[in-house]
Amino acid sequence: WCGGIRAETLANSALVDKLHICEIRPDRLEEVRTLTHPATATTDYKAIIANPDISVVYISTTPEQTHYPIARDCLKAGKHVLLEKPISMEFWEADELIQLSRDNNLKFTIGYSQRFNTKVAYAKKKIADGTLGKVVNVMVSRHLSRSLGKKIASRVRLSPAAMESTHDLDFVFWMLEPAKPVRVYSQGAYGYMKELNGSYDTMWTTVT
């Protein structure tokens, strides 16, 4: 789903010299190959890592548990990494990935796309230049359709609310730099999604 979208975007980008793709399902691999016309296509990500012509790896995989080991292997092989959220399922895994990138002088970032939203970037600019004055409170609400919630729940362990609200948290923290959160409180409520994957339908989060 998302991986195919990312591959098409990369195939059409002037910043990408050659595209190499990996997909574990042969039928999906062939489908994406037809859409993107890559230099190479494989079902084993280790073939991507072993290719000396590849300098950057974009990781967009499910389940989420695969993010850490694939990103780790890429960083150890000297590849720059753009990783879709979540960075990992455990804090120590995230810490290790960040340290690996620093130790190997590699670029490593998570695909928080709201930073490239012109409205969000404009708001950050106006906060930085003082137009909006001192920001003391930010409130964000996000609403998903039931159909999108079902689609997300079918492929990830995390709740749809958690998967989407992470974008909101990121752009708020980004806009308010260099301020950092010191306390987080969150609460959820079950509903329709509970029977699908045991996740919350609604979440409230307060960050101070």
Question: What residue ranges belong to the model's regions?
Answer:
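N-terminal Rossmann-like dinucleotide-binding module
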Residues: 1-36, 60, 172
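Glycine-rich, N-terminal phosphate-binding loop of Rossmann-like dinucleotide-binding domains
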Residues: 60-62, 142
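Rossmann-like dinucleotide-binding domain that binds NAD(P)(H)
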Residues: 148-208
